[in-house]
Design a protein with these regions (language model features):
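Active-site Tyr-X1-5-Lys
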Residues: 1-16
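Mid/C-terminal beta-alpha module of Rossmann-like enzyme folds, strongest
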Residues: 62-129, 146, 151, 157-171
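Short aromatic/basic micro-patch
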Residues: 16, 53, 82, 143-144
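Alpha-helical membrane-targeting segments
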Residues: 31-53, 99-140
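Conserved SDR Rossmann-fold cofactor-binding beta-strand/turn motif
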Residues: 18-19, 23
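Proline-centered turn/helix-capping motifs that create local helix->coil transitions or kinks
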Residues: 12, 25-29, 124
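Substrate-positioning beta->alpha
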Residues: 30-31, 47-67, 74
Length: 171
């Protein structure tokens, strides 16, 4: 991002887009697709933290509209909704027709989990999948705002729970 702003200082017109967690079909072993594949395999635990989500068609449409607009040299946060992880996990589980993750993972439990994950990765037993940052974020409840993009373009964002139902069959 710093390089983009440097380019702006050189005279380029730039728009920075910071999306929330982007949900889209396919790619079960990458990005947000790992949420679907992990829950499908049988995730037992959930947390009560929140984060921002957006559907990939909304990202594409909004970026296209920004490129066609007169707007330049600004940064936008693209989110449709701030949702609790527990609710998202339950929605994904229901859409995949698998058991919901019913046990609450406390901050202590997620701390232990990331340390075990780090140890197993250090010993080359498995690839790193759960970091300290992920553990901390899973309990964070700081909402993100999309007011700037809403006031500029007045976009209509897809309902995330409905979109999860739509894309779940691709996993």
């Amino acid at each position: 991002e710093m390089e983009v702003w440097r380019g702006q200082q050189e005279g380029l017109k730039v728009i920075i887009v910071n999306p929330g967690v982007i949900l889209g079909p396919g790619f079960p072993s990458q990005g947000s697709g790992t949420l679907f594949s992990t829950i499908k395999k049988g995730l037992s635990y959930h947390t009560l933290g929140t984060t921002a989500f957006i559907a990939i068609p909304d990202v594409i449409t909004t970026m296209y509209r920004l490129m066609k607009s007169d707007c330049c040299n600004e940064r936008f946060t693209l989110i449709a909704e701030n949702l609790v992880f527990k609710d998202v996990f339950f929605t994904i589980a229901d859409a995949l027709k698998v058991k919901r993750p019913t046990r609450y993972a406390s901050p202590l439990l997620t701390t232990i989990a990331w340390k075990i994950d780090a140890l197993l990765a250090f010993l080359s037993i498995k690839k790193r999948t759960f970091s300290r940052v992920t553990a901390k974020a899973s309990h964070s409840a700081i909402p993100y705002s999309n007011q700037k993009i809403v006031s500029q373009l007045e976009p209509t964002f897809t309902n995330i729970k409905a979109y999860i139902q739509e894309i779940a069959p691709t996993f």
